[in-house]
């Protein structure tokens, strides 16, 4: 393999100004679009020696056949052009979004002569105002039903409206007071439009203003003894308050913002958007991003912003994000432009709307208070959405079958890997060394066959892998040695095995008797070499071996100098990544429980410090690490622990 690509431009040919670049393949298809503050500095990163590039970047660069660039006047112009080209070319190596077009919205068609309210999944009506997205259609219908009591806007179809005009008879909603009846002349088109604009204003966050206005009208009607009008205003107030009650109050009344949470791993990211208007959550949007190249969180946020506000949605003045991207100022400028472009939206008084949509858009990271709590909730929802996405994907039988076939072909296996075992090692500064074994059969976890290993001594991870694989493979021999009867659950080796112990160990051996089609270790070439040594010494045959390296997601085979590259977002890589992550989780959980057990034992040996006080100490400080950092005076603040006992705890932890 050549050390660089043949189409690499000379350094002097690439300008140092801001610009946008495109990589194309032999058919001139655009593979990747990127922007740069300094084109020469950015593009030089792609033309380093291939062996030093991230694997996904290397794949893109070697797939491409040419690169071209366009110089612009500023970073902001680069951002705009990048956005335009990504939309135009849909490059496969840029972040790919799984769209959320199926979400229902509440729409008010202000662009029509007689506006109407409707629930829709399409956002194509010109001049319409959209609210949402909502997670359930019934939630919108409940809100609309309450709102029509206060703002009786037309909600019928065009056919029903024309029939009412021709017959002079209103529909049922007009008879029960949930439509003002513009079809039969009960109100003029202008009066009906004002009702629709009030509906929009309330949904946009001006709810308190309308409640105050209706309350004042109710008092005036009662003062003039027009009790029928006062009752109508009272019912309208109750309906609006009920509609407001369906939206969670999270911030002050005058706060408009969008909060974004992102949960991501090497292959995908889930995005959660909370739409807050007037201090209330007015909509929730969730979608999944397929990551092709290894993008940082800041770069991912930039792409998320472009996706979220590419349509008719006007960004609020404040947007909460997990981290600020490097070009936050330019991104804010672009969002401000989108905000001003979407002002006016079909209302009769665009100047008023422009006033509401004026001002710069600013990206922020919430540090404390209610906004930080909202941002944390968005992030938690995003992480849960990512887990749900991965779980649903892994439970898809067709996807699992394709994954087996692809893994079999990529690794040169005779049979599909219907049983896979994965091993991971965990330790804390070479202490409490443990390992995990997880089992997937037919692409699904078999938790009853998971095993945990305790490793007394080990020089490094490769030695630990060798020990664990040796112990596991010993169970596959026809006549296992005494060492193989050691429980693979962290217990110490019993030197004097009586008949009952041998029988129990034999039962455990039978549980280990099923050989894996594919044995995976968490790691690269060194770990795979250690596992291969254990496999060869065991004499066991018919077991294929592979390793998956962290971060790069490369699959290594024994004796190979180059990794096997499974396609990004493929079902095969997803399955291997999932079993690796499960092994890591299982090892970490066991390692933490060992540390907690050890520290509890150490503390329990201190005279006067019983189980209740040990529990109180750990509860007060939250973790062993925080307890170790605490001074004797801080430890003494714990209920039931005096200065003398605190000093003993401090000294004992300092000795370890």
Curated annotation (Swiss-Prot):
Q: Does the keyword Cytoplasm apply?
A: yes
**A molecular function GO annotation:** DNA binding
Keyword list (alphabetical) reads: Cytoplasm, DNA damage, DNA excision, DNA repair, Excision nuclease, SOS response
Describe the location of the UVR domain by residue ranges. 208-243
Q: What's an example GO BP annotation here?
A: nucleotide-excision repair
The primary location reported for this protein is: cytoplasm
The answer to whether UniProt assigns keyword NADP to this entry is no
* SMART domains, sorted: GIYc
Q: SUPFAM superfamilies, alphabetically? A: C-terminal UvrC-binding domain of UvrB, GIY-YIG endonuclease, RuvA domain 2-like
Cite the Pfam families for this sequence.
Answer: GIY-YIG, HHH_5, UVR, UvrC_RNaseH, UvrC_RNaseH_dom
Report domain GIY-YIG positions: 16-95
Gene Ontology cellular component list: cytoplasm; excinuclease repair complex
Q: Where in the cell is it found?
A: Cytoplasm
Quote the PANTHER family the UniProt record gives: UVRABC SYSTEM PROTEIN C (PTHR30562:SF1), UVRC/OXIDOREDUCTASE (PTHR30562)
Function text: The UvrABC repair system catalyzes the recognition and processing of DNA lesions. UvrC both incises the 5' and 3' sides of the lesion. The N-terminal half is responsible for the 3' incision and the C-terminal half is responsible for the 5' incision.
Q: How does it assemble?
A: Interacts with UvrB in an incision complex.
User: Which family does the similarity line name?
Assistant: Belongs to the UvrC family.
Task: Name the chain's protein.
Answer: UvrABC system protein C
Organism, by scientific name, is Leifsonia xyli subsp. xyli (strain CTCB07)
